[in-house]
């Protein structure tokens, strides 16, 4: 892992960006919200709120798969566009990656009317050119979880197979890569210059950027890290699955934005990581994530009306089981996600 060098007051400037524009007691917000919310942001390690927006409601939503990781905050932009925010690991980061209630998270967002999700996650870099504090827009996934995380809304007695060849939504990916330049948008300095947003078309010569999803909570051995590099892995985390799979089943467009914190364990030439380095990278990434999210929310509000529409209705025709043979209680459960698809 690399030890970064901060220049001047750049880190302090970045940290100040994460301060709320308004001091609001979230507990006192209304517990209901009328009207659909079409965009959601899921925050990962280091991103626990959207400080550039105006919170208007804080919702606790019960689903057939339990409760989400925490309350869902509805906030509005200056123009009044509503956005849902959910902290993946809970407000106090008390959920292990394997324990995140992903089915409840996605189901609750679906219930709000969400059509697209932009998810943030801290990752380790598997490639030299992806430096700590760089951001990555992955296009492919390799699943190295162990099967202990529930990864589908369907179950015994009701079988469906969602298409997952393109695990991230191509239209949402394009909206993000078109809106954010590879260089010059992300702030902060390290020994190699300003952070870069790595995308398939703009920085990777049209080649896929692949994220490895491991079970955790331990990090990779050096042998594993080198294996993932040999597979063409770009970055590694513990969170993209089953989140992306469940979003696809729920007919929600999904794209993860990865925030690099270190070089995983493959790079023996780098200095040992320090607490100062990790904290500095997380804070800088958090500030840039807030800036990036604010920009992308405005872009989605202006241009994202068609995103997710091509997924609507897709799961109705992905079912292999005749609905007439499905138990009523199971159909009622699926009605939460897909009202009107099958008679209850």
UniProtKB/Swiss-Prot annotation:
<feature type="binding site">
    <location>
        <begin position="121"/>
        <end position="122"/>
    </location>
    <ligand>
        <name>phosphate</name>
    </ligand>
</feature>
<feature type="binding site">
    <location>
        <begin position="88"/>
        <end position="89"/>
    </location>
    <ligand>
        <name>phosphate</name>
    </ligand>
</feature>
<keyword id="KW-0328">Glycosyltransferase</keyword>
<comment type="similarity">
    <text>Belongs to the PNP/MTAP phosphorylase family. MTAP subfamily.</text>
</comment>
<feature type="binding site">
    <location>
        <position position="238"/>
    </location>
    <ligand>
        <name>substrate</name>
    </ligand>
</feature>
<comment type="subunit">
    <text>Homotrimer.</text>
</comment>
<comment type="pathway">
    <text>Amino-acid biosynthesis; L-methionine biosynthesis via salvage pathway; S-methyl-5-thio-alpha-D-ribose 1-phosphate from S-methyl-5'-thioadenosine (phosphorylase route): step 1/1.</text>
</comment>
<feature type="site" description="Important for substrate specificity">
    <location>
        <position position="275"/>
    </location>
</feature>
<dbReference type="InterPro" id="IPR035994">
    <property type="entry name" value="Nucleoside_phosphorylase_sf"/>
</dbReference>
<feature type="binding site">
    <location>
        <position position="45"/>
    </location>
    <ligand>
        <name>phosphate</name>
    </ligand>
</feature>
<dbReference type="GO" id="GO:0019509">
    <property type="term" value="P:L-methionine salvage from methylthioadenosine"/>
</dbReference>
<dbReference type="InterPro" id="IPR010044">
    <property type="entry name" value="MTAP"/>
</dbReference>
<comment type="function">
    <text>Catalyzes the reversible phosphorylation of S-methyl-5'-thioadenosine (MTA) to adenine and 5-methylthioribose-1-phosphate. Involved in the breakdown of MTA, a major by-product of polyamine biosynthesis. Responsible for the first step in the methionine salvage pathway after MTA has been generated from S-adenosylmethionine. Has broad substrate specificity with 6-aminopurine nucleosides as preferred substrates.</text>
</comment>
<dbReference type="GO" id="GO:0006166">
    <property type="term" value="P:purine ribonucleoside salvage"/>
</dbReference>
<feature type="binding site">
    <location>
        <begin position="262"/>
        <end position="264"/>
    </location>
    <ligand>
        <name>substrate</name>
    </ligand>
</feature>
<keyword id="KW-0660">Purine salvage</keyword>
<dbReference type="GO" id="GO:0017061">
    <property type="term" value="F:S-methyl-5-thioadenosine phosphorylase activity"/>
</dbReference>
<dbReference type="Pfam" id="PF01048">
    <property type="entry name" value="PNP_UDP_1"/>
</dbReference>
<feature type="site" description="Important for substrate specificity">
    <location>
        <position position="220"/>
    </location>
</feature>
<dbReference type="GO" id="GO:0005829">
    <property type="term" value="C:cytosol"/>
</dbReference>
<keyword id="KW-0963">Cytoplasm</keyword>
<keyword id="KW-0539">Nucleus</keyword>
<dbReference type="InterPro" id="IPR000845">
    <property type="entry name" value="Nucleoside_phosphorylase_d"/>
</dbReference>
<dbReference type="InterPro" id="IPR018099">
    <property type="entry name" value="Purine_phosphorylase-2_CS"/>
</dbReference>
<protein>
    <recommendedName>
        <fullName>S-methyl-5'-thioadenosine phosphorylase</fullName>
        <ecNumber>2.4.2.28</ecNumber>
    </recommendedName>
</protein>
<keyword id="KW-0808">Transferase</keyword>
<dbReference type="GO" id="GO:0005634">
    <property type="term" value="C:nucleus"/>
</dbReference>
<feature type="binding site">
    <location>
        <position position="239"/>
    </location>
    <ligand>
        <name>phosphate</name>
    </ligand>
</feature>
């Amino acid at each position: 892992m690399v030890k970064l060098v901060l220049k001047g007051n750049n880190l302090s400037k970045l940290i100040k960006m994460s301060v709320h524009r308004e001091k609001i007691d979230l507990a006192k917000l209304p517990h209901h919200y009328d009207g659909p919310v079409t965009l959601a942001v899921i925050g990962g390690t280091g991103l626990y709120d959207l400080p550039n927006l105006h919170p208007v409601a804080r919702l606790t939503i019960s689903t057939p798969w339990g409760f989400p990781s925490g309350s869902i905050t509805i906030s509005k932009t200056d123009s009044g566009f509503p956005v849902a925010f959910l902290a993946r690991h809970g407000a106090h980061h008390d959920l292990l990656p394997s324990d995140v209630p992903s089915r409840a998270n996605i189901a609750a967002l679906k219930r709000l009317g969400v059509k697209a999700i932009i998810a943030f996650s801290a990752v380790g870099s598997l490639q030299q050119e992806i430096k700590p504090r760089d951001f990555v827009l992955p296009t492919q996934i390799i699943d190295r979880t162990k099967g202990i995380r529930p990864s589908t809304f369907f179950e015994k007695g009701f079988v469906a197979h969602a298409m997952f060849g393109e695990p991230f939504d191509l239209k949402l990916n394009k909206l993000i890569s078109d809106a954010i330049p590879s260089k010059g948008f992300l702030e902060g300095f390290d020994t190699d210059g300003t952070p870069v947003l790595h995308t398939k078309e703009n920085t990777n010569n049209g080649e896929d950027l692949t994220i490895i999803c491991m079970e955790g909570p331990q990090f990779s051995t050096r042998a594993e890290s080198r294996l993932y590099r040999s597979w063409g892995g770009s970055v590694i985390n513990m969170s993209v699955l089953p989140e992306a799979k469940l979003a696809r089943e729920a007919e929600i467009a999904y794209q993860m934005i990865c925030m690099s914190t270190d070089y995983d364990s493959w790079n023996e030439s780098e200095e040992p990581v320090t607490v100062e380095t990790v904290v500095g990278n997380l804070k800088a990434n958090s500030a840039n994530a807030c800036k990036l999210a604010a920009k992308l929310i405005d872009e989605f509000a202006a241009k994202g009306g068609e995103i997710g529409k091509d997924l609507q209705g897709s799961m109705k025709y992905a079912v292999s089981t005749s609905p007439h043979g499905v138990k009523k209680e199971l159909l009622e459960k699926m009605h939460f996600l897909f009202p009107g698809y099958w008679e209850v």
